[in-house]
């Protein structure tokens, strides 16, 4: 079985018998917040009961956090679970995604026999989404996926352009799905979210606790949409107890971790330009992304050479629109980033 995502720490341990310095997964470098860990431990006595299938308490708290009605929220077993539920609920015949972007959109779409069209972003424009994307949206395209910021490029789509894309989708009878799982790492995230457009009706926003709160192993995400009938269909399309009681407890605790979130945002804002400068000083081409990860170009053999030295990047060779020699690295703590740069310097000598 071949895995196509980063974060395969278990595979590395099985191969090398040790843990790696993992830059392949874009999660908080500060780890699980202490308050969340305590909440999971405190919830263990409830593990003998079925979890609330509707996540009532968590959705109520998310409604206050996001400023949307409770009925416009659906929780799932990570954002990936919600992507599949959405596709299974709608069963689109034709869909549009950018290239490069997160692979699970196409994987989910193809699981229902959907024809996936790729809009190839231009390398000379640093893979930015431009208004040319609107022209690719036409009647017969049932669903459009946009990642904000895009994974793996880190590029943001300007909110006025996002609104233009949404209106084009509405005119064509198309559902727009905006993946904001990495957006909350930005201090100015409120300036880039599509939440203010939810009233349009043909919009679904995907979010996750996974990345910002370092909860990848807990699995917890949620969808926002004014189309409550669609959310009910998504609820019915998966297993009835999709979010464990421990994950619900973790989510409730995470929403109290405001100081932790500010610390993570400050760390990424400080370290991203430093890591960018360090990579460029080694002669590597680095995109000016805004996310908690960076896309850069190097030799095709770089990734494996680093693996042998105990550090793992996300090879982007399997991303349509990229190819061999493209890599994504997470932005981690200062000492970890310095260790990566040191290992890179050794490999590039």
Which residue ranges define each predicted feature?
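Active-site pre-lysine segment of PLP-dependent enzymes
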Residues: 110, 127-140, 152-176, 180-212
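PLP-dependent enzyme catalytic core of the Aspartate aminotransferase-like
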Residues: 160, 308-309, 318-349
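Short loop-beta-helix segment that forms the pyridoxal 5′-phosphate
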Residues: 51, 63-85
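Short beta-strands and strand-loop turn motifs
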Residues: 118-120, 143-150, 176-180, 287-288
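Conserved PLP-binding catalytic core of the aspartate aminotransferase-like
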Residues: 268-269, 279-310
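N-terminal "arm"/small-domain region of PLP-dependent enzymes with the aminotransferase-like
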Residues: 1-49
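PLP-dependent aminotransferase-like
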Residues: 88-146
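PLP-dependent aminotransferase class I/II
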Residues: 31-33, 54, 202-287
